[in-house]
């Protein structure tokens, strides 16, 4: 079932003119998709409740650094089948069905979100209040037909609470005015509003790192990079040069860190290189000692890394390596 869903998502994204990565296994995300300024980090799950806290934190951190929208596409929760046209949320990440995701891409956003107690909608509180006052309808009258308290109506008008879909429809019909607003599941900032700081997540994971990786991370940090270490992604760290212009990811390096190079490491590094090209950024494999030169992979030993002065020097080194392989 998961493989079918993954295949359907790939077909949909191609149909919608996205550039997409190859699927990843054992990662906090399965696909990266990009079209113009819109970027998705997509996790495919049959049961959206199977997402772990560790996976979600890493997915959110990577999404924030890449200015991408993290999203889960699934078919069910622990207790029931997911409703079409409804938005669920797990650890601050929006989760929808394939059909709901497709509708959003085609310009039809969902309007219902799942929460404790049922399904709710976002409404325009200002329009509610203006219309009620214009029609000279009291708060008490509206509360009575809606079967909620006066206090709840006040909260709706102040956008401090949202009604259930059933209550919202009753109010719309009584006032004869549209109030329900769509939910934009592709909004970057909205998708990351519950994001923890990168620094907290980095410090937490760093304590669990291997010694060699710590050495490399320390060197990159001393150069002046902002760093995010990962354990559930195809790369080991993301190094970002501090910059004022956030329009592109030119100064981001997806970094793989391994003491010994082998076929599996080379395969992973080539996948990461594809990601970097898709996102107009860079990739780097740092090893204890370099072995065979692979023209498709930008690599260096830790001793070479230690000789690099700062972020500018490292980025120039990578650019020269890339040009020499063309």
Swiss-Prot record:
Residues 128-183 form the HTH cro/C1-type domain. Pfam families: HTH_3. InterPro entries: Arc_TR_HTH, Cro/C1-type_HTH, Lambda_DNA-bd_dom_sf. Coiled coil: none annotated. GO terms for molecular function: DNA binding; DNA-binding transcription factor activity. Keywords: DNA-binding, Transcription, Transcription regulation. PROSITE patterns: HTH_CROC1 (PS50943). Residues 139-158 bind DNA. This is Putative HTH-type transcriptional regulatory protein MmarC5_0898.
């Amino acid at each position: 079932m998961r493989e079918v869903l993954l295949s359907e998502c790939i077909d949909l994204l191609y149909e919608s003119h996205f550039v997409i990565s190859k699927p990843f296994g054992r990662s906090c995300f399965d696909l990266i998709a990009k079209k113009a300024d819109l970027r998705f980090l997509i996790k495919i799950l049959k049961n959206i409740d199977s997402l772990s806290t560790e996976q979600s934190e890493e997915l959110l951190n990577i999404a924030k650094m890449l200015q991408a929208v993290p999203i889960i596409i699934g078919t069910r929760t622990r207790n029931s089948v997911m409703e079409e046209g409804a938005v669920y949320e797990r650890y601050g990440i929006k989760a929808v069905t394939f059909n709901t995701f497709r509708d959003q891409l085609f310009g039809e956003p969902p309007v219902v979100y799942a929460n404790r107690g049922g399904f709710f909608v976002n409404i325009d509180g200002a329009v509610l209040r203006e219309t009620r006052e214009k029609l000279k309808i009291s708060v008490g009258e509206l509360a009575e037909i809606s079967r909620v308290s006066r206090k709840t109506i006040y909260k709706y008008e102040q956008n401090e609470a949202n009604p259930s879909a059933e209550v919202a429809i009753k109010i719309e019909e009584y006032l004869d005015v549209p109030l329900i607003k769509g939910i934009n599941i592709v909004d970057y900032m909205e998708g990351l509003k519950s994001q923890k700081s990168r620094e907290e997540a980095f410090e937490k994971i760093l304590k669990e790192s291997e010694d060699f990786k710590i050495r490399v991370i320390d060197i990159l940090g001393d150069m002046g990079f902002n760093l995010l270490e990962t354990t559930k992604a195809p790369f080991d760290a993301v190094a970002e040069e501090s910059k004022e212009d956030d329009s592109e990811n030119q100064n981001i390096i997806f970094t793989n860190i391994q003491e010994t190079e082998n076929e599996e490491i080379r395969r992973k590094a080539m996948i990461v290189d594809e990601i970097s090209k898709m996102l107009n950024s860079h990739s780097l494999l740092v090893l204890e000692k370099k072995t065979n030169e692979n023209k498709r992979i930008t690599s260096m030993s830790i001793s070479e890394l230690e000789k690099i002065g700062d972020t500018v020097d490292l980025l120039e080194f990578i650019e020269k390596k890339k040009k020499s392989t063309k």
